[in-house]
Structures are given as structure tokens and as C-alpha cells.
Design a protein with these regions (language model features):
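Active-site environment of divalent metal-dependent phosphoester hydrolases
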Residues: 53-56, 80-83, 196-203, 266
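C-terminal regulatory/interaction regions
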Residues: 2-5, 10-36, 210-213, 217, ...
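Histidine-centered active-site/metal-ligand motif
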Residues: 47-49, 202-205, 261
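Short, flexible loop segments at boundaries between secondary-structure elements
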Residues: 218-240
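Active-site rim elements
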Residues: 104, 196-199, 240-245
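Short, Asp-centered acidic motifs that coordinate Mg2+ and/or phosphate
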Residues: 190
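Active-site rim/loop-helix segments in enzyme catalytic domains that contact anionic ligands
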Residues: 2-186, 213-222
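Short, well-ordered beta-to-alpha junction loops that form the rim of enzyme active sites
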Residues: 129-132, 193-197, 203, 233-234
Length: 293
């Protein structure tokens, strides 16, 4: 869940789902297809911004990496519009004194943070959407963070001043084609991304879900189509009849990865973190998912 947030209006306290709080009876304990050995499998995670992979799925990524699974990550943007927590780095934040660009320097800095987080998680295969191998017809594209604002109900709304090069402003079809190209290259057995609501509603998270959905439509019955696709569970819904998976992952690796994302996340103690909005959240080693496909 990225802290990307250029808020032009007063809003209610931000609202986030609590991870791993409700586990359905009969929930799976594995994201892999039945009888798949972890050391022979590949999982592809598709996220919107640097830090999302850690806060939403970090314990799961570390869990499978430790089991010998090939874990891949595609990140859609570099998080150029994120808020910055450390005072000594706030010149990187768009709109703050000292910022002389449109978030490019922050994006570069966050790429470095992402590299540190992935090392903590034990993940060594990472690409950006729009860059090889995730390109449509081999044409590289840089997708920018769309940003967001907090609405009066504590839920995200679209950023009214997002750029034309932002992820949500660009057409969906080439983005989906780029993901298809990456899937052909990686050949994952399992794909993990957001559910339709984007987890907590960030416009870029919702777009990433739409990209994955369209990519699966394009793939159809192609032999490279992932056997299972999972969506990160947001608020638990007892009426949701889809298969749930609950992964009891590595909370220690997740916390260390969070510490790498210092512009976005403050780790308060072993069990608690917060974004720039100072809403305390649990560092959960349990991460739940619902089957999408």
C-alpha cells in the first residue's frame, strides 16, 4: 500500500484493511496449485509502487523465497508522488521546498529503497512495467505514479492533478500487453496482485488489477497463463465465497524490508508501523488472499 498521496483537501482519518485478522474455515495454506513443490514453482507478484510489495505481501514473498520458489516482482511505477517522512529527505517530495522536479529524484530514491527491501525478502527478480521484459511490442514506457487524495470518508480518490504520463492516464491495452509479454518470458505458475478494490482503493492499485484482468483475457487458454491468480484480500467479507488462502509468512523479513522503505514507512516497534499520515498499523506475518482466476 503506497503512501503516495498529494492531498488537496481536508479528509477523514485514512482507513486501511487489517491484514490476516479473519481466516475462513477451510482456507488454503498455500498459493501454489495442489501437489506443486515450492522449489519447482514460480510466483509473479504485480504491484503499483515501491513499498506495496512489502506492506501487502512481504511476509508471503519471503516465505516462498525461503522455500526455494522463484519469486518475481513487477512494479508499475516508481512512486514519484509519494509523501516523504524523514525531514532531511523532504526536498524530494513534490510541492515541498527544495523540490525542483516532478518527483523524478524521489522515484530514483525509492528504486534504491525497493532494492534494499527485496534483498531483505530474498527476492532477486524484479522488473518495472514498461521495461524489458514487460513491454508492449518491445517499446519501453515509463509509467508515473498517479498519486491520490484522501476523500472525506477516509477512502482514496483520484488525484485531480495527475500527469498525462501517469499509470491511470495511459491506455489500459498496452499496459496489459506489456504484462502479457512478461508472463510469456517468466512463465509463472501463480500470479498475485490486488483484488478489484485495489486493497484500500488507491487508483494505481485498481489500475494494476485491471491490467492483470485484461492480460488474463488476452492470454485466454495460452499455455503460459498462470494456473492460479490471487488477489490480496482487503476488508474481510463473510459473504465472499471465493477460496481464501492464508499464508503464515516471515514477519521478521517483512519488518526489515519495511525499514528499507524509509521515505514511506516508519517502523515503530516489532509489531507496528505507520505511513506519513501517522495511522498505526499492525505488521502482520499473516497475509490473506482470495482466488481471482
Amino acid at each position: 500500500m503506497s503512501a503516495s498521496d498529494n492531498s488537496p483537501q481536508e479528509a477523514a482519518t485514512p482507513s486501511y484493511p487489517t491484514q490476516g485478522e479473519r481466516i475462513a474455515s477451510g482456507a488454503k495454506r498455500d498459493l501454489l496449485p495442489t501437489n506443486y513443490a515450492p522449489e519447482q514453482a514460480r510466483i509473479l507478484f504485480v504491484h503499483a509502487h515501491p513499498d506495496d510489495e512489502t506492506s501487502s505481501t512481504g511476509a508471503t514473498m519471503a516465505h516462498y523465497a525461503q522455500k526455494g520458489t522463484e519469486v518475481y516482482l513487477i512494479t508499475a511505477t516508481r512512486g514519484e508522488l509519494g509523501e516523504v517522512i524523514p525531514p532531511q529527505l523532504q526536498h524530494l517530495e513534490v510541492g515541498k521546498p527544495g523540490c525542483t522536479d516532478n518527483g523524478e529524484a524521489l522515484g530514483e530514491y525509492r528504486v534504491g529503497e525497493l532494492n534494499g527491501a527485496l534483498e531483505a525478502l530474498g527476492v532477486y527478480h524484479h522488473f518495472f512495467l514498461g521495461q524489458e521484459p514487460a513491454t508492449a511490442e518491445g517499446v519501453p514506457v515509463l509509467y508515473r505514479d498517479s498519486g491520490m487524495a484522501w476523500g472525506p470518508n477516509g477512502k482514496p480518490i483520484a488525484n485531480p492533478v495527475s500527469s498525462d504520463s501517469s499509470l491511470t492516464a495511459q491506455p489500459l491495452e498496452p499496459q496489459a500487453q506489456a504484462l502479457v509479454a512478461a508472463i510469456h518470458e517468466i512463465q509463472p505458475d501463480v500470479l498475485v496482485t490486488y483484488d478489484a478494490d485495489g486493497g484500500y482503493g488507491h487508483p494505481d492499485h485498481v489500475r494494476v488489477y485491471e491490467i492483470v484482468k485484461r492480460a488474463l483475457e488476452i492470454l485466454g487458454d495460452d499455455e503460459d497463463r498462470p494456473l492460479l491468480t490471487w488477489g490480496i484480500e482487503g476488508e474481510y467479507d463473510p459473504k465472499d465465497t471465493r477460496v481464501q488462502a492464508a499464508i503464515f509468512g516471515d514477519g521478521t523479513a517483512k519488518r526489515k524490508a519495511m525499514e528499507a522503505h524509509r521515505t514511506q514507512i516508519t517502523v515503530l516497534d516489532d509489531k507496528t508501523f505507520e505511513y506519513s499520515n501517522k495511522v498505526p498499523q499492525k505488521i502482520s506475518a499473516v497475509e490473506t488472499y482470495r482466488v481471482l482466476d
